Amino acid sequence: MFADIAVQHWAFAVYVVGAICICLTMIGLAALLGGRAYGRAKNKPFESGVDSVGNARLRFSAKFYLVAMFFVIFDVEALYLFAWSVSVRESGWVGFIEATIFISLLLVGLIYLWRIGALDWAPKKRVLTDKKPD
């Protein structure tokens, strides 16, 4: 039984062993051929020649995280739609109805996010004051 599995998957085993060998070779050559500079100054973090002042932790607005989450969510949904579009002939009308329901749920979610203001980048107060008078 093990022989049958080994015969079927020998190419994958060769690929894995080759990938591991290439990685180990690159790490070994970098360790052997890489430049070495020891000293007290090398242990300090690089700050572009300027002594660091203050806290290194910067706070980002939650809007950046929202944009990233929306991108991931809608990108994954686009992958599902792409997979459906490749097999649209095999799935027939049932697949079409399922894709329509899926797209409808996406639109409902997008409308909900738009209504609660999650897609507004600037606060309402600033948007209203930045408009130019006609």
Swiss-Prot record:
Any S-S bridges, and between which cysteines?
none
Q: Which Gene3D superfamilies match?
A: NADH:ubiquinone/plastoquinone oxidoreductase, chain 3
This protein's GO cellular component annotations are: NADH dehydrogenase complex; plasma membrane
Q: What is its EC number?
A: 7.1.1.-
Q: Where in the cell is it found?
A: Cell inner membrane
Which residues are listed as membrane-spanning? 12-32, 64-84, 93-113
Molecular function GO labels:
NADH dehydrogenase (ubiquinone) activity; NADH:ubiquinone reductase (non-electrogenic) activity; quinone binding
Membrane topology of this protein: Multi-pass membrane protein
Catalytic activity annotation: a quinone + NADH + 5 H(+)(in) = a quinol + NAD(+) + 4 H(+)(out)
**Keyword Transport listed:** yes
What are the alphabetically sorted keywords of the record? Cell inner membrane, Cell membrane, Membrane, NAD, Quinone, Translocase, Transmembrane, Transmembrane helix, Transport, Ubiquinone
State whether keyword Translocase applies. Answer: yes
> For this UniProt entry, what is the primary localization, expressed as one broad class?
membrane
Recorded superkingdom? Bacteria
Pfam families this protein is in?
A: Oxidored_q4 (PF00507)
Q: Assembly and partners?
A: NDH-1 is composed of 14 different subunits. Subunits NuoA, H, J, K, L, M, N constitute the membrane sector of the complex.
Family membership: Belongs to the complex I subunit 3 family.
Q: What does this protein do?
A: NDH-1 shuttles electrons from NADH, via FMN and iron-sulfur (Fe-S) centers, to quinones in the respiratory chain. The immediate electron acceptor for the enzyme in this species is believed to be ubiquinone. Couples the redox reaction to proton translocation (for every two electrons transferred, four hydrogen ions are translocated across the cytoplasmic membrane), and thus conserves the redox energy in a proton gradient.
Name of protein: NADH-quinone oxidoreductase subunit A
User: Which organism does this record belong to?
Assistant: Aeromonas hydrophila subsp. hydrophila (strain ATCC 7966 / DSM 30187 / BCRC 13018 / CCUG 14551 / JCM 1027 / KCTC 2358 / NCIMB 9240 / NCTC 8049)
Recall the taxonomic lineage recorded for the source organism. Answer: Bacteria, Pseudomonadati, Pseudomonadota, Gammaproteobacteria, Aeromonadales
